[in-house]
Amino acid sequence: MDLHHPLLKEFPEHRETIQWLKVSDEQFRKKFDEYHQADDKICRIEEEIDFATDQETDELKMRRAHLKDQLYRQLRGATNAAVR
């Protein structure tokens, strides 16, 4: 079972927009990097490479979900702006 949730896999329909925003929007890139760092940390915990309390793991998962929501909103906004 694949534990990782990379944005390109989560939102394949936004692949080009993700690539464009990573190089053109510093705020997006920072959130993108933070999302992937959280995702990597969660996977390391779930694979028992790193250790964390249940509370720490839950907080990290909530942070990842919040970042994913923010990034998705930004992707939708950029996609809608490109369509106009």
Residue ranges and their predicted role:
Residues 1-84:
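Extended, charge-rich alpha-helical interface modules
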